[in-house]
Amino acid sequence: MIIMQNTKETIEVLNDLIQINNDRITGYEKAIKETKAEDEDLKVLFATMIAESHRNKIALATEVQTMGAEVENGTTTSGKIYRAWMDVKAVFTGHDRHTVLANCEAGEDAAKRAYHTALEHESLPAYIREMLVQQQGNLMASHDEIKSLRDQYA
């Protein structure tokens, strides 16, 4: 019975992370639209972040399917870990580099918190934990890059 409960919890954690990655994709798609034409470098960076989240989603979804469960393809409005990215998307009011980057950083903070919370689940199998730690490391690097760029335009 404990194994089934652990599997259920693992599936829930993975699906929540799929949803936060969906939020991240949606957020960066919005950021691309809100970014001025002359800020092509930011558009390329945001496209890279979108690709990163797609890779994360594929890896997470593969594990969910391997466990015989259905993949949650929504966003965190129906999830449990963090809904912050949706709030971030709603506050895109300015189109200057600093504002766009500041909003992206807030979204990255939400993703960081989601992965931190996910890794607090002690019942995660070691191979899942290893995958999440790797994804978390990539997200940390992305966060730091966004923050560094934001600070340049403060």
Regions found by a protein language model. Give the residues of each.
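Amphipathic alpha-helical hairpins
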Residues: I2-A154
